[in-house]
Amino acid sequence: MSVFAGKHVLIVIENLPAPFDRRVWQEATTLKENGAEVSIICPKMKGYDKSYEQLNGIDIYRHPLPIEGHGAFGYLIEYSTAIFWEAWLSCKIFLKKRFHVIHGCNPPDLIFITALFFKLFGVKYVFDHHDINPELYLAKFNKKGFFYRSMLFFERMTFRAADFSIATNESYKQIAIERGGMEADKVTVVRSGPSLKRLRITEGDPAYKKGRDFLVGYVGVIGVQEGLDLLLESVKHIVQKRDDVQFAIIGSGTALDEIKLMAEELGVKEYVDFYGRVSDEKLVSVLNTCDVCVNPDRPTEMNNLSTMNKIMEYMALRKSIVQYDLKEGRASALEASLYAKNDDTLDFAEKIMFLLDNEEESRRMADFGYDRVINKLSWDYEQVRLIDFYREVLELPEKAKVAVY
């Protein structure tokens, strides 16, 4: 008998579509593979514009999200629209087939508003803590005030509404306990372990190097706090000394146009390719071609306490890494990475060049990271934590065999 046969889990995402949100999709497919019925509510975005579709037996309901918020008014419109559609679609799904759990994924910390209504019917609320929004606000706007206090308020309300919480690392678990007031035994760490089925090592494609000897890669969001401006300054340091390195930047975000303009202004445009959001196949192909991968996240409190998916994806593809010295970045990569002095773009550039010019050391670091993922951090290990967590949420009395694929 499957572990969760007869159980229905509704997953709600506000800021990304499924299956694009890789962590959520891994969680959803793991629950489905172990017998649960799974439905997802998420926004429509480019390439994910069907109002309804079923993938791998998972029902996906997508709603319009007219704008991505900028400033107080923009965020008000975005979040109000999302809350309306989440509430409406939740009711529609509940009437079609009762769900037992709402699994809410932030940002923002507002999904509890929908969950509170269904708690009246015995539905449990699981909060999947992806981002620490007060710190995210500070990283974006660098000021405290009414909106910062609002972030803290909604975070507290989210934890109070939650029956259980999932943290992506130990730092987030401490926030759930100390700032959110949750009991320690109600918070479980489930890391965003990379899927080794998706991230397969290949020869790559030399065409991405554009005729140069080396390729340095970045994958992730392109926003203010991700430090792509710092990376471009490091690129400038490198191209002033050598012309044999190409850079590949994969991802999109609110700062993309600004970063492209900056590349032109710094005179490094011909050395940097912006690929935008790409398919998994292309992402894996580009990263497999890279000699070194980077994470230029700014040393903010948000980034210091957050585990970035890109780090473990680099490790899963056997790449050495350069990043700034942040707590959770170091906790994930350990010896797979070199750590530049925070905000020191010259030091960052020099560490990239060191790895490019010292193949043996780069390979040693890459092998360390790969072994760490294979033996400890991959989704094969994390999904067992998720299954055990959901057994507790659903009060299943006896352990059943877990499907690990």
Place the predicted regions along the sequence by residue.
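N-terminal subdomain of nucleotide-sugar transferases
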Residues: 1-48, 52-59, 238, 402-405
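Conserved donor-binding/catalytic core segment of Leloir-type glycosyltransferases
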Residues: 10, 166, 209-235, 248
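An aromatic- and histidine-rich active-site surface loop
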Residues: 47-48, 82-86, 99-135
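Membrane-proximal helix-turn-helix segments that form the acceptor-binding/catalytic region
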Residues: 91, 110-121, 146-165
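Carbohydrate-associated surface elements
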Residues: 171, 193
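Nucleotide-sugar-dependent
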Residues: 226, 281-286, 295-316, 322-332
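Nucleotide-activated donor-binding/catalytic signature segment of Leloir-type glycosyltransferases, i.e.
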Residues: 257-284
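Conserved acidic donor-binding segment of nucleotide-sugar-dependent glycosyltransferases
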Residues: 337-345, 354-360
